[in-house]
Structure formats: structure tokens, C-alpha cells
């Protein structure tokens, strides 16, 4: 049986930390920022952790395959 390939789109969007959690970037933070206030744009540039356990298991399978 051949080796499992990792999902390249998921690898570009998610990163696994050393503790095993999944880090992701927030959406809506790349363009049309003049319509959003400064507090919101600052928050959108910060990365966050994935909090859905079932999605985390699926994404780990895609990234670490």
C-alpha cells in the first residue's frame, strides 16, 4: 500500500504546535480593512487555536499523514 499523502491545502492553513494543538489564522483579515475598526483588525492579525475536537482530529489526519 502506498504512503498516505498530506493534504497540501490543509498544510498551508493549519500548523501543529509542539503540544499537539492546531494553530490557525483568523478569516477576514487580509483586505478591505479600511471598513473595519482598529481593534478588530488587530485581533484579526493574531492567530488562534482550533477549539473543535472533532475537526482537530480530522485536520491532524490531513496534516500529519
Swiss-Prot record:
Which SUPFAM superfamilies does UniProt cross-reference here? Answer: L35p-like
Q: Where are the compositionally biased (Basic residues) regions? A: 36-45
Supply the InterPro entries for this chain: Ribosomal_bL35, Ribosomal_bL35-like, Ribosomal_bL35_CS, Ribosomal_bL35_sf
> One biological process GO term for this chain?
translation
Q: Does the keyword Ribosomal protein apply?
A: yes
GO CC field: cytosolic large ribosomal subunit
| Positions of region (Disordered) | 28-53
| Name of a matching Pfam family | Ribosomal_L35p
| Keywords annotated in UniProt | Ribonucleoprotein, Ribosomal protein
Gene Ontology molecular function: structural constituent of ribosome
Which family does the UniProt entry place this protein in? Answer: Belongs to the bacterial ribosomal protein bL35 family.
HAMAP family per the record? Ribosomal_bL35
Entries under NCBIfam families matching the protein: rpmI_bact
User: What is the name of this protein?
Assistant: Large ribosomal subunit protein bL35
Taxonomic lineage of this organism? Bacteria, Pseudomonadati, Chlorobiota, Chlorobiia, Chlorobiales
Gene that encodes the chain: rpmI
